[in-house]
Every structure is written in C-alpha cells, then in structure tokens.
Swiss-Prot record:
InterPro entries: DHBP_synth_RibB-like_a/b_dom, DHBP_synthase_RibB, GTP_cyclohydro_II, RibA, RibA-like_sf, Riboflavin_synth_RibBA. This is Riboflavin biosynthesis protein RibBA. Its cofactor is Mg(2+); Mn(2+); Zn(2+). Mg(2+) 1 binds at E29. Keywords: GTP-binding, Hydrolase, Lyase, Magnesium, Manganese, Metal-binding, Multifunctional enzyme, Nucleotide-binding, Riboflavin biosynthesis, Zinc. It comes from Mycolicibacterium vanbaalenii (strain DSM 7251 / JCM 13017 / BCRC 16820 / KCTC 9966 / NRRL B-24157 / PYR-1). The gene is ribBA. The lineage of its organism: Bacteria, Bacillati, Actinomycetota, Actinomycetes, Mycobacteriales. Pathway: Cofactor biosynthesis; riboflavin biosynthesis; 2-hydroxy-3-oxobutyl phosphate from D-ribulose 5-phosphate: step 1/1; Cofactor biosynthesis; riboflavin biosynthesis; 5-amino-6-(D-ribitylamino)uracil from GTP: step 1/4.
Length: 423
C-alpha cells in the first residue's frame, strides 16, 4: 500500500506556496495531479508543472468566482464522463505576451485568484483553463478540481488552485500511477495525499449538518422527540428519535444508549425478510424506550449499505442467481460496505452525546464512529432474527464482514418461527 502524507502537511505546503500531489480513487481517473494555490503561482512553479505534467494547465475556482468573472461553461451540455466543469479559456488582458509562457500563465493564474479582478480583466479564449468547482468541494464531488479549491481554502487563501495531471516518466504515453507518484513526490520533496483522506479530514474537522426541526412522535414504543437534520453538502435528510434528556441540567451526555440505523426501505417499510433491518430498528426503539434515555438515529442515504436502492435491487437479483451479499456488490463494481458515519457522528455530538453504549452487531460501525471523537464505552448486541429467507445473508455478514451474530448455527429451517424470539 502506497505511503501517503498527512492532509495537515499538504495544507501547510499549499499555504507556503509549494505544490502537492493529490491522487484520486483507482476506480475513477486513477491519476495524480500536481496542485498549488493559484494566488501563489510563479513562473518557476508553472514551468515545473509543465515539465512533469500533460501541460493542459487548469485553474479550479469556487463557483462565486466564476460568476464574478463571467466564466461561462465551455460547452452548454457537459459531456465529460467525470463531470469536470470546464469554462471558456482565458488570458490576462494586461502584463502578458502571447499568454502561453510560464510567466504569462502564472500572471493569469494569480489574476484569476485576485478578489478584485473583474471579467474585463481577461481575454477569451486564452491559454489557461478555468474549472468550476462544486459548492461543498470534495464532500460533493471527489475530484481534483474540488480538492484544489478545498486545499487553497483550508490554507487560508483564495479558493482557487492550479492543477495538471502528472505523466509517467517510465512511459511518456501514459499517466503516472500511485507507486510512481510516491517516488516522484519523494524526489521533489512534495506531499502526497489522496482525495479520500481529504474527504475524511473535512468530515472530522468541519460541521456539515444543520438542525432543521423538532417534533413529538408518539410510537407503539412510547413517545420520542424527532429531531430532523440536513446534510449541508448533500441532498440527504436524517432524523434522530430521542428519548429522555441526553444533555442538559440533569444529564451530562455520557453513557447514552444509541442506535445508528441505516435506512432500509425494503426491510423497514415493506417488511422484507431478506434482511434483519426492520426487526433491528424495532428492537432498538423498544430497548431505548425501556431505558428511558437514548437515541435511535435513522441515517438516510445508507440504503443497501450505502449503494442505493436500485443497486441494492440489482444485488438482490445476483443473490437470487447464487451470489452472496458481498460478491453481488463486488460484481456490480461496488464496495461491500460504502457507508460513512461522519454525518451520524456530527448529529450525535449536536444532540449532546459524549459517550455511548452502541446498539450494533457490526464492529466496523464502532470503528466508524469512534474515529470522530465519540467515546464508545460498550457495544450492546441486538437480537438476531433469522429466518429461511435471510439465514444465508446473516451467515455471510458473520463470516465475511465480521458481524457478531451469535446462534446462527442453531437455526433450523424445519422449525417454525424465527431464531431470536420477541423483544
């Protein structure tokens, strides 16, 4: 596995006017870009970039900068397979020659990052390619465009970067891959980070949820307080069902019974027996109600362990043909578990949870939440509800995904009822 540097080092280097190397997912472009802050552009930096990259130099910009400078899309209907938002090319109107030299392009880059620049300061077309970054950065789109803008912003600079793909020194007709990028970064004393690490860093260090509403929800397990949240950078809504006082005059937020439940339309709503999601949700509500204090956090966007409803149905189709739940996902080119718990962790912190007893049979969920500063003092198992339709699925979760599901070996399809009984 390729050694990566810290996001903190990359941000510090960007602030100091150095370049960094950023790699994306191997299932996406699988390339590394040389990135520096546009306002720090120098002829030397641009010349270095031209020497070791494809030479197609781009300047990612925050959307409001593109609007202020009148940078319209290069083509009305974006057909780029990765959704890169190219705008019309530009040169600085003053202080440049033909616009193509390292000195000229550095001038244009700095001007694009100048907060006082206006549309009339540029000629179009030109030799620098501005790119429009998605609002929300890598949390909305895991691309180099957004990574460059995020790094500049985190460095305290204008949200404008300079990027270009690094070419292979072994095969000049190809782009450099991860191992070669590590060697390149070491040779030139550059930080090497991944977009995945930048996403994780932002999820840990920035608040990206908003509390929207609270209402009383009477259920068959008693009354809960429903607290609604939105993810600021994603079109996803979540709801926490809260029982009792989590933190306040009479509670310190510690030792809270918590269930983080992933949305499952088929199991939670339709009562599908292919999974145990519906019974787990019901059991969690009952256990929190009996406790008199706790949270059941319902995470939207986690359907099918994060792959979405349609992909889940496609995975079911493969399972009907003989694949297990893990292999079905992999055959679709999807991870066995794509869930991220950063949003859930922020919601729990906002509710006042400081330490908790986590209701789950999935040890990975504990790791996913623990990484965000929440102290998990105990993992409380949920009852196992096996039936003839889900027994193979549950055994796969136990044997291949490490879920702690005790008693599955006692399941007997010939015996009526479900293993686990009523809660």
């Amino acid at each position: 596995m390729t050694r990566l540097d810290s996001v903190e080092r990359a941000v510090a280097d960007i602030a100091a006017g150095k370049a960094v190397v950023v790699i994306d997912d191997e299932d996406r472009e699988n390339e590394g870009d040389l990135i520096f802050a546009a306002e720090k552009a120098t002829p030397e930096l641009v010349a270095f970039m031209v020497r070791y990259t494809s030479g197609y130099l781009c300047v990612p910009l925050a959307g409001d900068i593109c609007d202020r400078l009148g940078l319209l899309p290069m083509y009305a209907v974006n057909q780029d397979k990765h959704g890169t938002a190219y705008t019309v090319t530009v040169d600085a109107k003053k202080g440049v020659g033909t616009g193509i030299s390292a000195m000229d392009r550095a001038t244009t880059m700095r001007l694009l990052a100048d907060p006082d620049a206006v549309a009339d300061d540029f000629t179009k077309p030109g030799h620098v390619v501005p790119l429009r970054a998605k609002d929300g950065g890598v949390l909305r789109r895991p691309g180099h465009t957004e990574a460059a803008v995020d790094l500049a912003r985190l460095a305290g600079l204008q949200p404008a970067g300079a990027i270009c793909e690094i070419v292979s020194q072994k095969d000049e007709g190809a782009m450099a891959q991860t191992d070669e990028l590590r060697i390149f970064a070491d040779e030139h004393d550059l930080a090497l980070i991944s977009i995945a690490d930048l996403i994780e860093w932002r999820r840990k260090h920035e608040k990206h949820i908003a509390r929207v509403a609270e209402a009383r929800i009477p259920t068959r397990h008693g009354e809960f307080r429903a607290v609604g949240y939105t993810s600021i950078y994603e079109d996803v809504e979540h709801v926490a069902l809260v029982k009792g006082e989590i933190s306040g005059p009479h509670s310190d937020g510690h030792d809270v019974l918590v269930r983080v439940h992933s949305e499952c339309l088929t199991g939670d709503v339709f009562g599908s027996r292919r999974c145990d999601c519906g019974p787990q949700l019901d059991a969690a509500l009952a256990m929190v109600a009996r406790e008199g204090r706790g949270v059941v956090l319902y995470m939207r966007g986690h359907e099918g362990r994060g792959i979405g409803l349609m992909h889940k149905l496609q995975a079911y189709q493969l399972q009907d043909a003989g694949d297990d739940t893990v292999d079905a996902n992999l055959k679709l080119g999807l991870p066995a578990d794509a869930r991220d718990y950063g949003t859930g962790a922020q919601i729990l912190v906002d509710l006042g949870v400081r330490s908790m007893r986590l209701l789950t049979n999935n040890p990975a969920k504990r790791v996913g939440l623990d990484g965000y500063g929440l102290h998990i003092i105990e993992r409380v198992p949920l009852p196992v509800r096996a039936n003839a339709e889900n027994i193979r699925y549950l055994m796969t979760k136990r044997d291949r995904m490490g879920h702690d599901l005790v008693g599955l070996e006692d399941f007997d399809e010939a015996v009526p009822g479900e293993l686990g009984g009523a809660v």
